[in-house]
């Protein structure tokens, strides 16, 4: 995605990043983009051709639910997984609010470290409240990461802004059922191989 669109930037920082983008668009020898949507953006706004090089991943092995069962009581197909950075544009607040309105015995696992403010993390935890179905694992890697992907019932990515999400590519490589927001950076990855829901901001705009 375009960095200046991220919610964490204030007005001055946003303008500064937009200025940097314009300079790069006009002066760079080559521009590499991760998504076709951003490629079209540079063409439309700056009449600038770019080179599209998508992200790639290594195929990881399937794992039984050992570490995740010991740490959080997770078993095969008994949880819904979000995995990514804990930042506003990932749509985690929407996800928690929607999940709390469901009547399910599935757990919601929110896995990942925060690169945003402590205040935002506290807001998410307050929203989760005393719903003991919601589990925060913090940053994970290695075999624990592989176990979470291998045993998830559903992988969900409700983002408002993405580049080309590595976690979505990884989830698809494990054969997970994926549920994603309708932003182009997600839909061009999943094509017709996932459940796509209307982006929350678009829903608000249409109401």
What are these regions (language model features)?
Residues 13-30:
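Membrane-proximal helix-turn-helix segments that form the acceptor-binding/catalytic region
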Residues 121-143:
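Nucleotide-activated donor-binding/catalytic signature segment of Leloir-type glycosyltransferases, i.e.
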Residues 160:
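Aromatic "clamp/platform" in nucleotide-sugar-dependent glycosyltransferases that forms part
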Residues 37, 56:
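Carbohydrate-associated surface elements
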Residues 139-140, 147-152:
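Short alpha-helical donor nucleotide-sugar binding micro-motif in glycosyltransferases
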Residues 173, 177-180:
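Short hydrophobic beta-strand element within catalytic cores of glycosyltransferases
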Residues 78, 82, 87-101, 119:
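A conserved mid-protein helix/loop that constitutes part of the nucleotide-sugar donor-binding site
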Residues 194-202:
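Conserved acidic donor-binding segment of nucleotide-sugar-dependent glycosyltransferases
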């Amino acid at each position: 995605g375009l960095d200046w669109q991220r919610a964490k930037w204030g007005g001055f920082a946003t303008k500064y990043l937009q200025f940097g983008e314009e300079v790069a668009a006009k002066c760079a020898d080559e521009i590499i983009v991760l998504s076709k949507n951003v490629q079209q953006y540079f063409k439309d706004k700056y009449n600038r051709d770019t080179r599209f090089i998508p992200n790639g991943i290594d195929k990881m092995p399937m794992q039984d639910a050992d570490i995740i069962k010991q740490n959080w009581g997770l078993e095969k197909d008994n949880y819904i997984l979000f995995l990514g950075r804990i930042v506003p544009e990932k749509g985690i607040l929407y996800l928690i609010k929607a999940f709390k309105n469901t009547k399910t015995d599935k757990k919601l696992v929110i896995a990942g470290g925060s690169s945003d403010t402590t205040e935002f993390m506290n807001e998410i935890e307050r929203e989760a409240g005393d719903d003991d179905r919601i589990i925060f694992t913090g940053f994970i890697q290695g075999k624990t990461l592989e176990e979470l992907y291998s045993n998830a019932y559903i992988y969900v990515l409700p983002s408002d802004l993405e580049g080309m999400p590595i976690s979505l590519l990884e989830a698809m490589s494990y054969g997970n059922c994926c549920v994603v927001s309708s932003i182009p950076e997600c839909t061009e990855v999943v094509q017709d191989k996932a459940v796509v829901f209307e982006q929350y901001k678009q829903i608000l705009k249409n109401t």
